[in-house]
Regions:
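Active-site metal-binding core of divalent-cation-utilizing nuclease and nuclease-like domains
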Residues: 140-144, 439-465
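Structural motif
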Residues: 149, 467-471, 505
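Mg2+/Mn2+-dependent nuclease catalytic core
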Residues: 169-175, 475-494
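Domain-level recognition of nuclease-like catalytic cores that cleave nucleotide substrates
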Residues: 496, 500-524
Length: 524
């Protein structure tokens, strides 16, 4: 019997050379990469969310400019590139530079020292970082006779992490000093490529390089990072089959699950091809499990720095309009919460009309992560208190064990509408809807608030894997449990869902009109 060859998926690998030499699966993007490397624009900037393949893209560009043809054999670029010229490459990975001016200077000093040794550049003791950078670019050109490729990966990492700290202005000053020389040295530069997540326009990368081409929204580069559905189906069929077997699904059901969890990103209104988060997708296919990989990797750590009061604003981001100038050109520190959430991957483009983008949450993984993060702040509880209770709530909802589920829900809601002063501007029913929908989203349920059907408007529909819950909420001073039960029965709220193979449970819930929490419940 022939031995089955185990395919190697590049989980967390950002080295193009390692992927190619060690036999890892590579989704071929080299035709797009070649077009980028040979564009008429010398200076190019790409923004993509964290863990979206930017560093692998930079590493692939480095291999290309170093003329490493052997790494590209069998890929599309072989048909496009005829010369394979070896060029000098200056590469900076600013994610290694820390978040304080001393660490940024130390990182640049180390990189420059290595390059100066490589190109035999004599450095005066009093040389500034900017002068050293200038001398490296000129020296590399003079020694090789070839223009230099400059690759700056995660340029914004020190600026993000120092934001709202005493170190931010000093870090910004270093950027202004060092990177201002890029334009002055343009005759020595073949290609300059800068990647990041957020855009800080006050630094010299954007203010001095007025001819910097922002390719982040260009349709031809929409899929340069990430994995399209076509690429997933073409490259990962064995892994999808394996996931389907583990989850007891058909192949098509497994594809639908992967799509719901990790797909849904769009980066150009002129090219709305769905893009999967590559980090999450490859991890899921490697593990044969559907998990929240992106959030678990620390992707949500910067939210509190850039978005105030997100726990009460999150519902506003579901279908969020933002004008094109703000989304495409604004500084993250002054463009509002929507801009940061888009650049960081929490929101994506859902539509576009007459200069206005419509943004929304891309997929299940991001939705659950966002709501899970805001739940402790909204309920005024510690993370530890919330985690154990919400786990028990989901467990009992999935089993249909309503008495235990309602105990958990009561514990999470208790006193919150009254005690959380950030909710003071909302009426009491609106407070309860926000709290309950946040809880159900945070545990991974599919939630629809105020769902319209032929006979009326259902307060909330909550879907688990095996059960659909139809909720009618009534305050104690508005009829309470009796009125909620009557409305469910009279308007036949459960009927539209009975064609679903899942069990349907209609729940009447009475809520304290003073904001003290859940008073009573009844299966209607």
């Amino acid at each position: 019997m022939a031995e089955t060859r185990i395919r190697r998926l590049p989980v967390g690998i950002q080295s193009f050379e390692k992927i190619r030499k060690d036999g890892y699966l590579y989704v071929d993007k080299t035709d797009i990469i070649w077009r980028l490397a040979n564009t008429d624009n010398t200076y190019n900037y790409l923004s993509r969310p964290r863990r979206f393949g930017k560093s692998l893209l930079v590493d692939t560009l480095e291999a290309y400019f170093l003329g490493k043809k052997e790494l590209f054999e069998g890929l599309r670029i072989i048909e496009l590139e005829k010369e394979w010229v070896k060029r000098p490459v200056v590469r900076l990975d600013m994610s290694q530079a820390g978040a304080e001016p001393e660490s940024v200077r130390s990182y640049l000093d180390d990189v420059f020292h290595t390059l100066e040794a490589e190109y035999k550049i004599v450095v005066r003791q009093d040389c500034s970082l900017a002068v050293r950078f200038k001398n490296i670019i000129e020296g590399a050109y003079n020694k090789t006779g070839q223009q230099v490729a400059i690759l700056i990966d995660e340029y914004d990492a020190p600026l993000q992490h120092s934001w709202k700290t005493p170190h931010h202005e000093a870090c910004t000053s270093i950027y202004r000093e060092v990177f201002a020389i890029l334009k002055a040295n343009d005759k020595y530069e073949r290609f300059v490529f800068i990647t990041g997540i957020t855009k800080f326009t006050q630094i010299s990368l954007f203010s001095v390089l007025n001819n910097l081409s922002n390719i982040s929204f260009e349709p031809e580069y929409a899929a340069i990072c990430g994995i399209t559905k076509e690429e997933m189906l073409r490259n990962f069929k064995p892994e999808i089959d394996k996931l389907a077997a583990y989850e007891n699904h058909t192949y098509d059901e497994a594809v639908a699950q992967l799509t719901a969890y990790y797909d849904g990103y769009h980066f150009s209104h002129d090219n709305m091809a769905d893009i999967f988060n590559p980090f999450s997708l490859v991890n899921a296919l490697s593990d044969s499990k559907l998990r929240n990989y992106w959030a678990a990797s620390g992707a949500t750590s910067l939210l509190p720095k850039f978005v105030d009061n997100i726990e009460i604003r999150l519902k506003n981001f579901e279908n969020c309009p933002i004008d094109s100038d703000t989304l495409e050109t604004s500084d993250v520190t002054g463009g509002g919460a929507e801009l940061f959430l888009y650049q960081s991957g929490y929101l994506t483009i859902k539509g576009y009309t007459d200069g206005i983008y419509i943004l929304g949450i891309p997929n299940y993984e991001v939705r659950k992560a966002l709501y899970k993060i805001v739940l402790p702040a909204l309920t005024l509880k510690t993370n530890d208190q919330v985690i154990s209770t919400q786990s028990m709530l989901l467990y009992n909802l999935q089993l249909g064990n309503l008495p235990e589920a309602m105990k958990c829900l009561k514990a999470l809601v208790a006193d919150v509408p009254y005690s959380n002063k950030k909710l003071a501007s909302m009426d009491m029913e609106e407070r309860y809807r926000l709290i309950l929908s946040t809880i159900f989203n945070a545990i991974g349920c599919r939630v629809e608030v105020e769902k319209m059907i032929a006979t009326g408007r259902i307060d909330m529909v909550v879907e688990t894997i095996h059960i659909i819950y139809v909720l009618e909420l009534k305050l104690s001073n508005n009829g309470g449990i009796h009125a909620a039960t009557q409305q469910i029965q009279y308007k036949q709220y459960a009927e539209p869902f009975k064609a679903d193979k899942r069990r349907v449970v209609a729940l009447a819930i009475e809520l304290d009109d003073q904001g003290k929490g859940l008073v009573d419940w009844k299966e209607a």
